[in-house]
């Protein structure tokens, strides 16, 4: 008989793992505890059976638990590839107790420092933070391949009070570069344990390493197995971050903008005058790309910029997008620039400064 008595949850945080207990998912709304017990009774003697129900509506929540007297019943259930109950395919798995979510560390002697410049050394970091109090240890995380640090590290102080003082100032300037400081957190806080529902899957329990700061989501996997990260929007421009492979590649800054090839868009598409002007610019050896129609240095342009008007044929509108389109250009703000501020719905006149940049970070 089913009862309206309060039903236990999945497991208390301290419940030991019972190898004879199974989680049964995908149950039909019509499946009862008696029906569940009867079905799984064919695999072995059932010690306990439970269909989880909503405490208010008393309706089934679509899953339950079955506990066998011995592990042989569990093995028989797992050996069968497909299970169907009440005209619905169900999904039995080995049940694992749910662990309590680790609490965030609020008192610690260790901080995470991110966004360090390439030429910053561990001595620079240690010397800077010594103004706040005694530094017990400082480290930068290095890539073994290049033997260069990856723009972040950790500093350990003598007391938690020093950390509180440092973290009151979120951004610090080291070697003319703004860096971010946060309290270091254990790995259990930074990376959720997830769930495990099969014998072959290993629960990621008990990695006791101290990890990265709260805001550090995406720094590279680095060559130190006792530390790890999940995702970071990036305080070190020019790097791509990949975790958990513990690899990162430095993306070199381009020395000059890459100009598009002319073969895709013939100059004749912009009219005979445009083609003639471009040809004349090349002949004069100005070094300007014909597409830009940029005047030679020292000359006075006939218009406020080198772009053609919106009445000109060609893919200019497609290249920059309309004002109501979700284009990359629309995410930039306008300012004084050689480019014209007219002729485009979204006002391109500007050096294309990304609005997402704040204090040098994004």
UniProtKB/Swiss-Prot annotation:
Belongs to the Musashi family. RNA binding protein that regulates the expression of target mRNAs at the translation level. Regulates expression of the NOTCH1 antagonist NUMB. Binds RNA containing the sequence 5'-GUUAGUUAGUUAGUU-3' and other sequences containing the pattern 5'-[GA]U(1-3)AGU-3'. May play a role in the proliferation and maintenance of stem cells in the central nervous system. Disulfide bonds: none annotated. One of its GO terms (cellular component) is cytoplasm. This is RNA-binding protein Musashi homolog 1. The modification Phosphoserine is found at residue 191. GO terms for molecular function: identical protein binding; molecular condensate scaffold activity; mRNA binding; poly(U) RNA binding; protein homodimerization activity; RNA binding. InterPro entries: MSI_RRM2, Nucleotide-bd_a/b_plait_sf, RBD_domain_sf, RRM_dom. The modification N-acetylmethionine is found at residue 1. Detected in fetal kidney, brain, liver and lung, and in adult brain and pancreas. Detected in hepatoma cell lines. It is found in: Cytoplasm; Nucleus. GO terms for biological process: central nervous system development; epithelial cell differentiation; nervous system development; regulation of translation; response to hormone. The first RNA recognition motif binds more strongly to RNA compared to the second one. Pfam families: RRM_1. Residues 20-110, 109-186 form the RRM domain. The gene is MSI1. Keywords: Acetylation, Cytoplasm, Nucleus, Phosphoprotein, Repeat, RNA-binding. It comes from the Eukaryota.
């Amino acid at each position: 008989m089913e009862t309206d008595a309060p039903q236990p949850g999945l497991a208390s945080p301290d419940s030991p793992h019972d190898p004879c207990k199974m989680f049964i998912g995908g149950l039909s709304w019509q499946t009862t505890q008696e029906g569940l017990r009867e079905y799984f009774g064919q695999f072995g003697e059932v010690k306990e059976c439970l269909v989880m129900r909503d405490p208010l509506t008393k309706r089934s929540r679509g899953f339950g638990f079955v506990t066998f007297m011995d592990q042989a019943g569990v093995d028989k259930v797992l050996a069968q590839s497909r299970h169907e109950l009440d005209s619905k395919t169900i999904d039995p798995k080995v049940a694992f107790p749910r662990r309590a979510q680790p609490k965030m560390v609020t008192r610690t002697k260790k901080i995470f420092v991110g966004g360090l410049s390439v030429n910053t050394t561990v001595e620079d970091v240690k010397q800077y933070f010594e103004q706040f109090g005694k530094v017990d240890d400082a480290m930068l995380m290095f890539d073994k391949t290049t033997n260069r640090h990856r723009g972040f590290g950790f500093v350990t102080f003598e007391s938690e009070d020093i950390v509180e003082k440092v973290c009151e100032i979120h951004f610090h300037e080291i070697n003319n570069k703004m860096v971010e400081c946060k309290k270091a957190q254990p790995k259990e806080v930074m990376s959720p344990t997830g769930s495990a529902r099969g014998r072959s899957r290993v629960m990621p329990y008990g990695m006791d390493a101290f990890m990265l700061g709260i805001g550090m989501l995406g720094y590279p996997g680095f060559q130190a197995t006792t530390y790890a990260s999940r995702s970071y929007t990036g305080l070190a421009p020019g790097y791509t971050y990949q975790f958990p492979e513990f690899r990162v590649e430095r993306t070199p800054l381009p020395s000059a903008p890459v100009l598009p090839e002319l073969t895709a868009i013939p100059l004749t598409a912009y009219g005979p005058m445009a083609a003639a002007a471009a040809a004349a610019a090349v002949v004069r050896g100005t070094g300007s790309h014909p597409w830009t129609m940029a005047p030679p240095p020292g000359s006075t342009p006939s218009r406020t910029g080198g772009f053609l008007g919106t009445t000109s044929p060609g893919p200019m509108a497609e290249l920059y997008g309309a004002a109501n389109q979700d284009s990359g250009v629309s995410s930039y703000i306008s300012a004084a620039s050689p480019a014209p501020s007219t002729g485009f719905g979204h006002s391109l006149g500007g050096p294309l400064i990304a609005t997402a940049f704040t204090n040098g970070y994004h």
